Each structure stands twice: as structure tokens, then as C-alpha cells.
């Protein structure tokens, strides 16, 4: 697990991702941090967050973009191998929080909103909840993600 979250010297005072630590911290290096979002409907939901404030992917240098995508792919591979989801959703929207971050979300045909987006209209209830249906402990999944990121 990474050290306690500390905003960087260039953190923007009005940026929630610069200033606040949300989610379960799994890994970080000098440029990126990874958390698991705490979402009862989507327990296998991770974010790759730029540690420095940058709004657009194209603002990164080529090696930084490659590193970011390497981290996204490492998480995606773990989710596919361990959970066999119906689909992995990848997104970097930034309309609400203009700080570069990628969402990596395991989706299943049984999840509450499938095939809609995670913010879409609920399609069904999930008996027992999504975590029970996931079939893997979050601690084990988080450990596998952190290990893959350490090797990425």
C-alpha cells in the first residue's frame, strides 16, 4: 500500500483529485496513483490518477502517456484474469473533475446497470449485492492489482 496521501507542491486548491484522497489506495509512484473506488454497485472499479494536475491526456509527454496506458492495461488484465467480466469499461471523461484520471471498471451482464453506463438507469437489483456476485474478496483482488502495478 502507498504511503499516506500528501498533495504535491503543484496541487490546485480547487481540484478535488489534487487535494483529497478518496477511495482505497493501492499503489503510487512519482507520477501516478491508483485507488479502488468504493462503490457498492461496482466493487471492481479502479482509478488511475495523475499525481500532478493535468487536464488532458495530450498534455502528457509520450513516455507519460505510455506509462499511464501501461497501468490501465495492468489493471484490466488482472480484472479479466481473475473475474472474467462480460466487459471492461475504460473512461477518461473529466467533465466533473478536470484532472486526468482513468476509470477501469469490470462490468458483468448481471450488474445493476448493464448494458447501460455505470451512471445510467438501474436495470435490475442484484440479489445479495454485487460484492457477493463478484466471487472474490476485494482484499485479494486489490493485492493482485497492486502486484501487477508494481511489475508494470
Model-based region annotation:
Residues 1-152:
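HIT superfamily nucleotide-processing domains
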Amino acid at each position: 500500500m502507498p504511503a499516506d496521501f500528501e498533495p504535491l507542491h503543484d496541487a490546485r486548491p480547487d481540484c478535488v483529485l489534487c487535494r483529497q484522497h478518496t477511495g482505497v489506495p493501492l499503489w503510487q509512484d512519482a507520477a501516478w496513483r491508483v485507488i479502488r473506488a468504493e462503490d457498492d454497485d461496482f466493487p471492481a472499479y479502479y482509478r488511475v490518477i495523475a499525481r500532478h494536475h493535468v487536464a488532458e491526456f495530450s498534455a502528457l509527454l509520450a513516455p507519460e502517456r505510455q506509462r499511464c496506458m501501461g497501468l490501465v492495461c495492468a489493471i484490466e488484465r488482472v480484472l479479466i484474469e481473475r473475474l472474467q467480466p462480460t466487459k471492461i469499461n475504460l473512461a477518461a471523461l473529466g467533465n466533473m473533475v478536470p484532472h486526468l484520471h482513468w476509470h477501469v471498471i469490470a462490468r458483468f451482464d448481471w450488474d445493476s446497470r448493464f448494458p447501460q453506463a455505470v451512471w445510467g438507469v438501474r436495470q435490475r437489483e442484484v440479489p445479495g449485492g454485487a460484492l457477493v456476485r463478484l466471487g472474490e474478496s476485494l482484499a485479494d483482488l486489490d493485492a493482485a492489482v497492486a502486484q501487477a502495478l508494481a511489475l508494470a
